[in-house]
């Protein structure tokens, strides 16, 4: 079946902001699909609210819309662009849910748009738990006993009938949100109540428990002619009961017999057939009872998913690209296998290596959250590693996680930790074996298959052998084949990593590189995609004689280092290719565009450690290595690379050192006459109190050695400082604590700047909406800035110029500053690309990272910018040609862009939602408008926090904020909002003549503030933190060894109730000010205006 000629224009919906359960894998899938559809001759329109994506770059489609992903905005885009078809299978759960809404509300029919890639009926059969169960039973497939309920009474009755434990799964939610496992009635009440709120249709499925069964997934593809292939089988090392996104997974599956696999394969075909998936990729999950072999179908996703991204990277088979072509009528035997170039996509991939994926967690960012893993996903990223054996792949994957220190284990409670898995579970399994437990005991507690446990125990036995035979060459060779790093061997031998490397080199123990080719080396691959192994002789990565640039990626997604850095990496790759170099990418993250087989010239899927990078350098001998695009990951290993003679291009390592070292940086600022907030260091509690007294409170404290992840805090009093130092940090001469004067009421600015060593260009000058003290990664920001005077902007440009020249920046840097009383303070400078680069590039219409990369290989800045000149500059400034001054003109777009963040608080009930100096957001959205108010309102809608235009507001304002907040609340009252307030706030409002209803605080009478929220009477909560509300850990609740730290102040209860009830909330005066402007704009008329991204640059 050739391509469909009845379709010309296709609308693709992206997945929106990165959240837990829906991450960078959808940018990877989307980008692949857009490329495929364009090359097949279709016009493509893409809509996504996330600017930090390659798929929203204008090169990949005919029209890009960065707009909120809601039905109202999508209808406007459909009305304007008139697509023939909508492809909803590339944007995760978000896009599927929207497709269902657009179809059911009649919008698709009204504009004559047809769904391709998945029919409405199929989406519903796969997503609606009750329908899915019925469909499976009709197809003769076994599913778990379950019942759909919409109230607590029915849930309790069902659980009694099935017997505890039971699994609770809310309908139509992402990453298991709101679900869980209930072992008793009390837990059931809690989970069901939450699940009914989280489910958009307010139903949950109560399901019999299969905890401890083995979990498998098949990634399958089917075309319109009925051809069906299994791309990859994936085995979860962790048994059922842990979300597959939080499980360690292995491909291909290791413990299935051939008979079981064939049975599963046949069942998968029946599933796809029964659901009615005619074309595209699907992911099907099975559970197998290890005792009886009983197999049940758990669920299926009728779209590309996290697992399909993993399967694509594991096999080299590009599922998303092929699914997109199948959706427009191609069949598998008409599509080439892009890796071999010789075979067809109808061939099932076969692989001669093992792939291990391990999730990356950051629970320390969410104190108060339960650390135990369950059916609700909690990890923020993942790594993948490839080896010839399971042991080798596991070893490589563990070091790819980039966990700086071994986790602190609670050795008195090993058995509890084995029975209740937490993110440290692998460390506990190793600890159990080191402490003499046997495979059988560990299996009983963990229910992990004995085969995996025997492999892990063998590694611990090898540790003993290493200790006994120190410096034995054969044992060293064996350890390398089993995936041990030089660093781990060095720790066992108590020598330096360098010593082990020297011994290895002397005995010629080197890895060889093997190719990922989809066909177990049966055909020759065209696309160079490699992994290292010590279990091989022949090196398949033969270097070319071209000049090469090697780019170090950013490793697993984590908070503070996410998809934005991958965006920069990819732009870097393209820039070096355009300049005639061979671009080599090194990364370990399977979710990303940078690890796509056709992004770079050569891809090494390897851990980002000194050892692994040096081995690739030894093989490829690049002209230079780029460390400025991957966030902190490459910077952390830069020193070791330089010591080994690796050439780092761009900003020199000396400059990186100065910027990263507080004392050196402060000296440099002093030398060039710039200010930074006064600071001091302390090595004891007494010194800390003295430094703070000299600086004057409030102060910002950060220890150089962190315990329990509470890295930074703003402290207002000596008592708080003393408590902080005793509880949250180790303070000793070896581990000093840094204390900065905290600038209250300052405006914080974020500057992305590019320089070629002579000219300096501020690409983006952003103003943070939250006050200084909220981490810039968690604050919304606006470009161009809204509250800076003409004089101040000129002053900022000169300051940046002076600092960039002094740091000798070549390429890109990010500078954070604060402005207080018209004085400029430098907070920090990062000699690398920052997380705002994609946002700035989309706001100004100039690819900032590409320009920075070309500068690193010798191009000049005015020459590169001339292609985009003239671009809009500040009103009143006139620039005829670039290069008259060393300070190149700062872009000043006529449209306003707001970046807003998305923080996964609802995944971690128990965590306080206050913003502070510790970053916790996982993703971002962008709102574009003709003024700040419109842009902010759209950004809030896109972030899932839409502001109300009517209803009641609950206000409880700290004394220090009343002066600024009361007039703003009065303004909302004038706009017709009803105001409820606690006693002190109400009094202040009444003195301003505002009509207000007084509500008792908790414990001061009923109905109190919490009752009001629970009754659903409030449409917006405004609550700022008061200084008498302790901002430190106080009470602890929960059973050993899973103590949960948390605070239970009234403010905390109000914030968490608002979060739980999905009521929008504002926690700072700045956010309130922005919200008032946005609400006023929304009340004046619709803000549902959509604009093509490229048009916003021409305004």
From Swiss-Prot:
Binds 4 Mg(2+) or Mn(2+) ions per subunit. Mn(2+) 3 binds at residues 816, 828. Residues 945-1099 are annotated as: Allosteric domain. Its EC number is 6.3.4.16, 6.3.5.5. Its cofactor is Mg(2+); Mn(2+). Mn(2+) 2 binds at residues 299, 301. ATP 2 binds at residues 702, 741, 743, 748, 773-776, 816, 828. Residues 1-402 are annotated as: Carboxyphosphate synthetic domain. This is Carbamoyl phosphate synthase large chain. The lineage of its organism: Bacteria, Thermotogati, Thermotogota, Thermotogae, Thermotogales. The gene is carB.
């Amino acid at each position: 079946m050739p391509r469909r000629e009845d379709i010309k224009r296709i609308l693709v919906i992206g997945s929106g902001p990165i959240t837990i359960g829906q991450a960078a894998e959808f940018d990877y899938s989307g980008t692949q699909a857009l490329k495929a559809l364009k090359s097949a001759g279709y016009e493509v329109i893409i809509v996504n609210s996330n600017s930090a994506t390659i798929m929203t770059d204008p090169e990949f489609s005919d029209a890009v819309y960065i707009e909120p992903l809601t039905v109202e905005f999508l209808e406007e885009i459909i009305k304007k662009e008139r697509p023939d078809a909508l492809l909803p299978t590339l944007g995760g759960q978000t896009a599927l849910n929207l497709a269902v809404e657009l179809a059911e509300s009649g919008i698709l029919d009204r504009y004559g748009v047809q769904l391709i890639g998945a029919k409405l009926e199929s989406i519903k059969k796969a997503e609606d738990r009750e329908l899915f169960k019925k469909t499976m039973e009709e197809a003769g497939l076994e599913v778990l006993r379950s019942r759909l309920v919409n109230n607590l009474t029915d849930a309790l009755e069902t659980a009694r009938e099935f017997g505890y434990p039971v699994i609770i799964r809310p309908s139509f939610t992402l990453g298991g949100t709101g679900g869980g496992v209930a072992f008793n009635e009390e837990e059931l009440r809690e989970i069901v109540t939450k699940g009914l709120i989280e489910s958009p249709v307010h139903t949950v499925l109560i399901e019999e428990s299969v905890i401890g069964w083995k979990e498998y997934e098949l990634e399958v593809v089917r075309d319109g002619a009925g051809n069906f292939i299994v791309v990859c089988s994936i085995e979860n090392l962790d048994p059922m009961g842990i979300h597959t996104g939080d499980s360690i997974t292995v491909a291909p599956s290791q413990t299935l017999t051939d008979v079981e696999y064939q049975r599963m394969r046949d069942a998968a075909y029946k599933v796809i057939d029964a659901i009615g998936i005619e074309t595209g990729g699907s992911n099907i999950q099975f559970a197998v009872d290890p005792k009886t072999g009983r197999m049940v179908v758990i669920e299926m996703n009728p779209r590309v998913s996290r697992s399909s991204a993993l399967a694509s990277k594991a096999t080299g088979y590009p599922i998303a690209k092929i699914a997109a072509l199948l959706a427009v009528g191609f069949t598998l035997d008409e599509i080439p296998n892009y890796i071999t170039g010789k075979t067809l996509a109808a061939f099932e991939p076969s692989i001669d290596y093992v792939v291990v994926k391990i999730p990356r967690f950051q629970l320390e960012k969410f104190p108060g959250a339960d650390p135990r893993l369950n059916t609700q996903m909690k990890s923020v990223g993942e790594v993948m590693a490839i080896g010839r054996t399971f042991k080798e792949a596991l070893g490589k994957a563990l070091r790819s996680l980039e966990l700086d220190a071994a986790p602190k284990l609670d050795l008195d409670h090993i058995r509890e930790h084995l029975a209740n898995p937490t993110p440290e579970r692998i460390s506990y399994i190793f600890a159990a074996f080191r402490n003499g437990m046997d495979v059988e005991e560990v299996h009983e507690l963990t229910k992990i298959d004995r085969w995996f446990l025997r492999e892990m125990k063998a590694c611990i036995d090898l540790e003993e052998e290493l200790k006994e035979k120190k410096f034995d060459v054969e044992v060293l060779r064996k350890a390398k084949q089993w995936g041990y790093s030089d660093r781990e061997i060095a720790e066992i031998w108590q020598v330096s990593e360098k010593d082990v490397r020297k011994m290895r080199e002397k005995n010629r123990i080197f890895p060889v590189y093997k190719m990922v080719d989809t066909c177990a080396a049966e055909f020759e691959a065209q696309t160079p995609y490699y992994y290292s192994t010590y279990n091989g002789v022949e090196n398949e990565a033969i270097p070319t004689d071209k000049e090469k640039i090697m780019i170090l990626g950013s490793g697993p997604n984590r908070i503070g280092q996410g998809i934005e850095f991958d965006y920069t990496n990819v732009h870097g790759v393209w820039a070096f290719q355009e300049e005639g170099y061979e671009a080599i990418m090194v990364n370990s993250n399977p979710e990303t565009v940078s690890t796509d087989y056709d992004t770079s010239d050569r891809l090494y899927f390897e851990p980002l450690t000194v050892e692994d990078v040096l081995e690739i350098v030894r093989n490829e001998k690049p002209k230079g290595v780029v460390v400025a695009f991957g966030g902190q990951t490459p910077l952390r290993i830069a020193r070791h690379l330089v010591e080994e003679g690796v050439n780092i291009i761009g900003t020199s390592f000396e400059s990186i050192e100065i910027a990263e070292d507080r004392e050196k940086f402060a000296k440099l600022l002093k030398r060039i006459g710039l200010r930074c907030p006064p600071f001091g260091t302390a090595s004891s509690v007494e010194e800390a109190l003295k430094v703070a007294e000299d600086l004057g409170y409030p102060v910002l404290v950060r220890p150089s050695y962190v315990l329990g992840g509470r890295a930074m805090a703003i402290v207002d009093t000596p008592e708080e400082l003393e408590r902080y130092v005793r509880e949250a940090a180790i303070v000793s001469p070896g581990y000093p604590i840094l204390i900065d004067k905290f600038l209250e009421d300052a405006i914080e600015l974020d500057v992305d700047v590019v320089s070629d060593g002579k000219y300096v260009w501020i690409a983006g000058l952003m103003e943070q909406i939250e006050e200084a003290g909220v981490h810039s990664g968690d604050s919304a920001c606006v470009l161009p800035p809204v509250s800076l005077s003409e004089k101040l902007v000129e002053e900022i440009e000169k300051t940046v110029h002076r600092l960039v020249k002094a740091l000798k920046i070549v390429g890109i840097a990010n500078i954070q500053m604060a402005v207080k009383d018209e004085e400029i303070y430098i907070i920090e400078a990062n000699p690398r690309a920052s997380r705002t680069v994609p946002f700035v590039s989309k706001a100004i219409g100039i690819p900032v990272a590409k320009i920075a990369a070309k500068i690193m290989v010798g191009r000049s800045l005015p020459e590169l910018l001339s292609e985009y000149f003239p671009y809009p500059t500040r009103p009143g400034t006139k620039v005829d040609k670039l290069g008259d001054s060393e300070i190149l003109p700062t872009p000043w777009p006529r449209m306003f862009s707001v970046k807003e963040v998305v923080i996964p608080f609802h995944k971690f009930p128990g965590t306080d939602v206050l913003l502070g100096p510790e970053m916790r957001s996982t993703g971002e959205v962008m709102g574009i408008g003709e003024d700040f108010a419109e842009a902010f309102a759209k950004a809030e809608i896109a972030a899932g926090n839409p502001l109300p235009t009517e209803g009641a507001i609950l206000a409880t304002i700290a004394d220090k904020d009343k002066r600024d907040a009361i007039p703003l609340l009065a303004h909302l009252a004038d706009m017709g909002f009803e105001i409820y307030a606690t006693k002190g706030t109400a009094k202040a409002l009444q003195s301003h003549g505002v009509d207000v209803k007084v509500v008792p605080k908790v414990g001061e009478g009923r109905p109190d503030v919490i009752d009001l929220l629970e009754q659903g009477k409030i449409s917006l909560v405004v609550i700022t933190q008061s200084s008498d509300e302790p901002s430190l850990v106080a009470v602890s609740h929960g059973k050993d060894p899973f103590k949960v730290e948390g605070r239970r102040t009234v403010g905390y209860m109000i914030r968490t109730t608002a979060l739980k009830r999905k009521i929008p909330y504002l926690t700072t005066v700045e956010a309130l000010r922005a919200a008032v402007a946005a609400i006023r704009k929304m009340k004046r008329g619709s803000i549902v205006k959509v604009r093509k991204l490229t048009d916003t640059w021409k305004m």
